[in-house]
Amino acid sequence: MSWTGIALFIQLFFGIIIGLYFWNLLKNQRTQKVTIDKESKKEMEQLRKMRAISLSEPLSEKVRPKSFKDIVGQEDGIKALKAALCGPNPQHVIVYGPPGVGKTAAARLVLEEAKKHKQSPFKEQAVFVELDATTARFDERGIADPLIGSVHDPIYQGAGAMGQAGIPQPKQGAVTHAHGGVLFIDEIGELHPIQMNKMLKVLEDRKVFLDSAYYSEENTQIPNHIHDIFQNGLPADFRLIGATTRMPNEIPPAIRSRCLEVFFRELEKDELKTVAKTAADKIEKNISEEGLDLLTSYTRNGREAVNMIQIAAGMAVTENRKDITIEDIEWVIHSSQLTPKHEQKIGVEPQVGIVNGLAVYGPNSGSLLEIEVSVTAAQDKGSINITGIAEEESIGSQSKSIRRKSMAKGSVENVLTVLRTMGMKPSDYDIHINFPGGIPIDGPSAGIAMAAGIFSAIHKIPIDNTVAMTGEISLNGLVKPIGGVIPKIKAAKQSGAKKVIIPYENQQAILKQIDGIEIIAVKTFQEVLDEILVNPPTEQKPFHIEINKESV
């Protein structure tokens, strides 16, 4: 065989091998495609079957407010939301309030309301983007950030076309998706500090700037839109609505200073009845007034009321009944191991050493605070014992905090000084001040209440049980302003008080809108005594003691 024949044979041999190789590749590709198509058809069929199945609409969805009229008890909060977002220059907002009172529903509705106003910058296509801060996790390397956005560098892109070409791929975050609309962040107080700081920059610039080690302005392979994103940033002109169940002092000052703060309050008993009755009507069930009374004694917000109605209605359905009975409500209470809601009421009659103070808890909720004072003659040197208060408190931020003696305990020392200036000798007595209820009390606003209780206990003069009071007391007997005066007044009214004493400097025009209770503004502790002391059985008139104001 000649060399030419050998060369042709070798070429033919390798040609056959190469042909078999490519034929096998094509066969595998066809097999894979057929397999993928079969799998895709099976999955599509499964999806169609799943989409054909739907359960009934949950009761919580049925009773979700469709308009502002459906949100019960939050007229002031809704008014503030409209003022902040429905004008020509909408602002960022933080909404404080307990869970289940309508914060999210109000946020959804306020954007639709704003679209109706001609001056509003929100257009018809403005979007409402929701994000839960408790699940908004991010990667510190910048690979993923659902809030701000991220860049997928080629090393993380896998087999995509841009990854193989070495092109970084920007991914939009919620701040960009909300461009031209509203970004709602639920539980904004749980947002990671790094994300919070990034968002502050976005709120100022109204843009998101991304960077990548793989980006170069000189790279002509990078598409124009990616060049534009890296050079000019992603648009992020939106208005933020953050909702939280935390107190304002637990939110970073940097974000608070950029937002209008709106407060939603706890629902009152009658308002919870309205929510529960509406829920029962939606599922065509009847519930008696006694049943509503019992239900609202164990619920603290609208969501809990709806859930109880739904479970009780399930009991009625299984027994083919149209009515939700008291027995159904009692069964729900027992099976859910619910505890009754504490509802403090004023005393039945005036008593010595018993005074009605006022406290505020949560973002915008008040409560009546019964204070008990017992005084006995001391065997030797007198003592003072205080129970039911926080002994000390910690203030500051995550990076730095300081501990100090409880403000309530410090207020007691102010009270003793005032009583000494009035000619009394607290050191001659063993004084016990008790704040019942099991919840540690802190703050100086119970100052005048404690002073009144000690004065009453020493002189054996009863205190009017229909009067509640709040105010800090200074060393010279002046009544100083306090916070949370509106929820405190409303709490006094709900507890059955006929009068409420507040510091003179807390007078506001809006207080005139609160009906059903007399509001008395005082400047000195002597004025407090004039309003609260009741004549003892001997018809002895309460005496006046001048306060030494020259010690100021």
Swiss-Prot record:
Could you name the active-site residues? S445, K488
- Disulfide bridge positions per record: none
Which CDD domains does the entry link to?
A: AAA (cd00009), HLD_clamp_RarA (cd18139)
The organism's lineage?
Bacteria, Bacillati, Bacillota, Bacilli, Bacillales
Q: Which family does it belong to?
A: Belongs to the peptidase S16 family.
Matching Pfam families: Lon_C (PF05362), Mg_chelatase (PF01078)
Task: Give GO terms for biological process.
Answer: protein catabolic process; proteolysis
According to its UniProt record, where is this protein located? Cytoplasm
Tell me what this protein is called.
Lon protease 2
Protein role: ATP-dependent serine protease that mediates the selective degradation of mutant and abnormal proteins as well as certain short-lived regulatory proteins. Required for cellular homeostasis and for survival from DNA damage and developmental changes induced by stress. Degrades polypeptides processively to yield small peptide fragments that are 5 to 10 amino acids long. Binds to DNA in a double-stranded, site-specific manner.
Q: Which reaction does it catalyse?
A: Hydrolysis of proteins in presence of ATP
The entry lists its GO molecular-function terms as: ATP binding; ATP hydrolysis activity; ATP-dependent peptidase activity; serine-type endopeptidase activity
Tell me which UniProt keywords the record has, alphabetically: ATP-binding, Cytoplasm, Hydrolase, Nucleotide-binding, Protease, Serine protease, Stress response
This entry's comment on induction and repression of expression is: By heat shock.
NCBIfam families, alphabetized: spore_lonB
User: Which top EC class applies here?
Assistant: hydrolase
In this chain the Lon proteolytic domain maps to 349-535
